[in-house]
């Protein structure tokens, strides 16, 4: 019978072989907080950046963001574009749904004059454009909205009742095989937005699945499940959504973390709300009763007033954010993220 030392040697050899064959980060201990040296782009949500473990979405990788309708998928990707533009990166938006609203994008902080936009006629055209942009090496972030709208040419040209079983899945599988190595070489972040469908006849387990077959689930380095879990009200008026994002797959840091944040209508992700919560948790901001204070100075009664103070004092807000980012990215396990169980085989599931 093998001794513990021999078992450890065998395990180290196996892990070394796996990393050699599949790349660093293909396997790690679940509690391992060591982050890979990968360039990342902020998502616009401080809490989500921490949950991802490397400070944002990884460059040179494929990312899938999926969820129900009106859950904040496009808002999150536009927020990524806004953050990427702040660092001088070139962005492209492949709008297969033909639903991009430039006015809404500008409200989220996107400089609408700069991003490249394409509204392709079919799925093949969309993925060819994506491939050409990646191969150019000049585009840093590409958003494909959405996989469900990547309709194969044969389906568009066919009659309404024709059967095209598995056509979209084959298209995605072929495209991702071509794209993966090019994306890595170009150090380009490609984000696919995806929708949810219900599997028919599922008696046990989760009936939800994403469109476009299984290829994207395998090729994506990060998969984010985004859900609306509540409403934000000001009096009787609904002014935004409480949003929850679960990292169901992560090949660059430990997965299965989740985070809550607010999306305000016409403004996007509320950074001030996250800064207040994290600031209180890590004692940068003090709270006594309903009052919030920063450096012994009262900044507001109630969270709404404290958030307003941060908006009116951007220098202090920036200092609080940079202090928290430096501290928490070094120890992401102490952040406002909760590790949750992987509920289904592919990580898709309802939140508990």
From Swiss-Prot:
UniProt keyword Nucleotide-binding, yes or no: yes
Keywords: ATP-binding, Cytoplasm, DNA damage, DNA recombination, DNA repair, DNA-binding, Nucleotide-binding, SOS response
Annotated binding of ATP, by residue: 67-74
GO cellular component terms attached to this protein's record: cytosol
Xref: SMART domains: AAA
Keyword Metal-binding applies: no
Primary location group: cytoplasm
Free-text function comment from the UniProt entry: Can catalyze the hydrolysis of ATP in the presence of single-stranded DNA, the ATP-dependent uptake of single-stranded DNA by duplex DNA, and the ATP-dependent hybridization of homologous single-stranded DNAs. It interacts with LexA causing its activation and leading to its autocatalytic cleavage.
Similarity annotation: Belongs to the RecA family.
Name of the protein: Protein RecA
Designated gene of the protein: recA
């Amino acid at each position: 019978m093998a001794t513990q030392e021999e078992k450890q040697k065998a395990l180290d050899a196996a892990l070394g072989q796996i990393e050699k064959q599949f790349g660093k980060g293909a396997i790690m201990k679940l509690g391992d907080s060591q982050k890979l040296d990968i360039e990342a782009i902020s998502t616009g949500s401080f809490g989500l950046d921490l949950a991802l473990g490397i400070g944002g979405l990884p460059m040179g990788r494929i990312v899938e963001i999926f969820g129900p309708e009106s859950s904040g998928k496009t808002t999150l990707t536009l927020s990524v574009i806004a953050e990427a533009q702040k660092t001088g990166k070139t962005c492209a938006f492949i709008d297969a749904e033909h639903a991009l609203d430039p006015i809404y994008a500008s409200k989220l902080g996107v400089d609408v004059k700069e991003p490249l936009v394409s509204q392709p006629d079919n799925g093949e055209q969309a993925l060819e454009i994506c491939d050409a942009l990646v191969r150019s090496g000049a585009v840093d972030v590409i958003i494909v909205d959405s996989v469900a709208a990547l309709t194969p040419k044969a389906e568009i040209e066919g009659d309404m009742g024709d059967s095209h079983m598995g056509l979209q899945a084959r298209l995605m599988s072929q495209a991702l095989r071509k794209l993966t190595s090019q994306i890595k070489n170009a150090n380009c972040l490609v984000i696919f937005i995806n929708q949810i469908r219900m599997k028919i006849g599922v008696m046990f387990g989760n009936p939800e699945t994403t469109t476009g077959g299984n290829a994207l689930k395998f090729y994506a380095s990060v998969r984010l499940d985004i859900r609306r879990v509540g409403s934000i009200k000001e009096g009787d008026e609904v002014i935004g959504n409480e949003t929850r994002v679960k990292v169901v797959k992560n090949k660059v840091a430990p997965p299965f973390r989740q985070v809550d944040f607010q999306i305000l209508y016409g403004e996007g992700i509320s950074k001030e709300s996250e800064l207040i919560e994290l600031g209180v948790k890590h004692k940068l901001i003090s709270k006594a009763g309903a009052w919030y204070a920063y450096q012994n100075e009262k900044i507001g009664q109630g969270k709404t007033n404290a958030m307003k103070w941060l908006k009116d004092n951007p220098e202090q807000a920036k200092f609080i954010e940079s202090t928290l980012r430096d501290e928490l990215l070094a120890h992401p396990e102490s952040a406002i993220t909760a590790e949750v169980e992987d509920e289904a085989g592919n990580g898709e599931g309802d939140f508990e």
